[in-house]
Amino acid sequence: MERDNGTIQAPGLPPTTCVYREDFKRLLLPPVYSVVLVVGLPLNVCVIAQICASRRTLTRSAVYTLNLALADLLYACSLPLLIYNYARGDHWPFGDLACRLVRFLFYANLHGSILFLTCISFQRYLGICHPLAPWHKRGGRRAAWVVCGVVWLVVTAQCLPTAVFAATGIQRNRTVCYDLSPPILSTRYLPYGMALTVIGFLLPFTALLACYCRMARRLCRQDGPAGPVAQERRSKAARMAVVVAAVFVISFLPFHITKTAYLAVRSTPGVSCPVLETFAAAYKGTRPFASANSVLDPILFYFTQQKFRRQPHDLLQKLTAKWQRQRV
């Protein structure tokens, strides 16, 4: 083996077939994933429990939020395997099937969250910009459940190839779980990876920005309804827009920018291992931002839903009062 600026390159292989020295992953990913697991798992369970407890009065946005929390919960359940893997220095002992499943769950959560947040934003857009139009109110919750079913089918179709490309391999005498694909399949993965970014992120992000631009113009107009109820409605819509945009910018945008750059460089012939390793480190360094979406989503829910935000406070007051009565 031949060392090249900290990157190991096997002799006789193409210059872009490198084995990276990624010690930063052991320091960065286990703590971040542990926080996401410890914080995100109970938060999403609470969101699901609260929405299910109010199932008779569910709005369309609540139905979308419930499915968003389910996607986050499924991903959080896969994190213990990744925490163990990176804490052991990128050693994967769980087999090829578990590797494919974990990679699929990551991208299914990522693109499911993007689409469900887009659905929530579009529902808010309809309520603000077309409040009296009857066509978007037909079907009620049943229509929302149909939309969620379509979203899950689309996400599964989008992300199923990740389970095909992801695989285990041997590097430095240990088994690793490739995130995107083995290096030998990098050229074949490129069209799919780029299409997934465009269809699974860029198009929903563009639609979301268009909705929020229309909403901002409508909210800034002075000829709308007046009064405290209308003002509260506008404030709630503004909060939703700011928080959802923040989730996209923090969680999704850096990850997709660095992933796209890495895919392009990885598939370019003649790229040296140090350059390739730099792009790989940038891409893998933004993975925690994408994972943080499982924590940010339930915070978004509580920040924008006043009714559900009051429930934990009321429950805490009841428990405190009961505890004080027992002490007397």
Swiss-Prot record:
<dbReference type="InterPro" id="IPR017452">
    <property type="entry name" value="GPCR_Rhodpsn_7TM"/>
</dbReference>
<dbReference type="GO" id="GO:0016323">
    <property type="term" value="C:basolateral plasma membrane"/>
</dbReference>
<feature type="transmembrane region" description="Helical; Name=7">
    <location>
        <begin position="281"/>
        <end position="303"/>
    </location>
</feature>
<comment type="similarity">
    <text>Belongs to the G-protein coupled receptor 1 family.</text>
</comment>
<dbReference type="GO" id="GO:0001621">
    <property type="term" value="F:G protein-coupled ADP receptor activity"/>
</dbReference>
<feature type="transmembrane region" description="Helical; Name=2">
    <location>
        <begin position="63"/>
        <end position="83"/>
    </location>
</feature>
<keyword id="KW-0325">Glycoprotein</keyword>
<feature type="topological domain" description="Cytoplasmic">
    <location>
        <begin position="216"/>
        <end position="236"/>
    </location>
</feature>
<dbReference type="GO" id="GO:0045030">
    <property type="term" value="F:G protein-coupled UTP receptor activity"/>
</dbReference>
<dbReference type="GO" id="GO:0014911">
    <property type="term" value="P:positive regulation of smooth muscle cell migration"/>
</dbReference>
<feature type="transmembrane region" description="Helical; Name=6">
    <location>
        <begin position="237"/>
        <end position="257"/>
    </location>
</feature>
<dbReference type="GO" id="GO:0070374">
    <property type="term" value="P:positive regulation of ERK1 and ERK2 cascade"/>
</dbReference>
<dbReference type="GO" id="GO:0005886">
    <property type="term" value="C:plasma membrane"/>
</dbReference>
<keyword id="KW-0297">G-protein coupled receptor</keyword>
<keyword id="KW-0807">Transducer</keyword>
<dbReference type="GO" id="GO:0032962">
    <property type="term" value="P:positive regulation of inositol trisphosphate biosynthetic process"/>
</dbReference>
<dbReference type="Pfam" id="PF00001">
    <property type="entry name" value="7tm_1"/>
</dbReference>
<feature type="topological domain" description="Cytoplasmic">
    <location>
        <begin position="123"/>
        <end position="144"/>
    </location>
</feature>
<dbReference type="InterPro" id="IPR000276">
    <property type="entry name" value="GPCR_Rhodpsn"/>
</dbReference>
<keyword id="KW-1133">Transmembrane helix</keyword>
<comment type="function">
    <text>Receptor for extracellular UTP &gt; ADP = 2-methylthio-ATP &gt; ADP-beta-S &gt; ATP = ATP-gamma-S. The activity of this receptor is mediated by G proteins which activate a phosphatidylinositol-calcium second messenger system. Functionally coupled to phospholipase C.</text>
</comment>
<feature type="topological domain" description="Extracellular">
    <location>
        <begin position="258"/>
        <end position="280"/>
    </location>
</feature>
<dbReference type="GO" id="GO:0071380">
    <property type="term" value="P:cellular response to prostaglandin E stimulus"/>
</dbReference>
<feature type="topological domain" description="Extracellular">
    <location>
        <begin position="166"/>
        <end position="194"/>
    </location>
</feature>
<dbReference type="GO" id="GO:0045029">
    <property type="term" value="F:G protein-coupled UDP receptor activity"/>
</dbReference>
<feature type="glycosylation site" description="N-linked (GlcNAc...) asparagine">
    <location>
        <position position="173"/>
    </location>
</feature>
<dbReference type="GO" id="GO:0006909">
    <property type="term" value="P:phagocytosis"/>
</dbReference>
<keyword id="KW-0472">Membrane</keyword>
<keyword id="KW-1003">Cell membrane</keyword>
<protein>
    <recommendedName>
        <fullName>P2Y purinoceptor 6</fullName>
    </recommendedName>
</protein>
<keyword id="KW-0675">Receptor</keyword>
<keyword id="KW-1015">Disulfide bond</keyword>
<feature type="glycosylation site" description="N-linked (GlcNAc...) asparagine">
    <location>
        <position position="5"/>
    </location>
</feature>
<feature type="disulfide bond">
    <location>
        <begin position="99"/>
        <end position="177"/>
    </location>
</feature>
<feature type="transmembrane region" description="Helical; Name=3">
    <location>
        <begin position="102"/>
        <end position="122"/>
    </location>
</feature>
<feature type="topological domain" description="Cytoplasmic">
    <location>
        <begin position="49"/>
        <end position="62"/>
    </location>
</feature>
<dbReference type="GO" id="GO:0071415">
    <property type="term" value="P:cellular response to purine-containing compound"/>
</dbReference>
<feature type="topological domain" description="Extracellular">
    <location>
        <begin position="1"/>
        <end position="27"/>
    </location>
</feature>
<keyword id="KW-0812">Transmembrane</keyword>
<feature type="transmembrane region" description="Helical; Name=5">
    <location>
        <begin position="195"/>
        <end position="215"/>
    </location>
</feature>
<dbReference type="GO" id="GO:0007186">
    <property type="term" value="P:G protein-coupled receptor signaling pathway"/>
</dbReference>
<dbReference type="GO" id="GO:0051281">
    <property type="term" value="P:positive regulation of release of sequestered calcium ion into cytosol"/>
</dbReference>
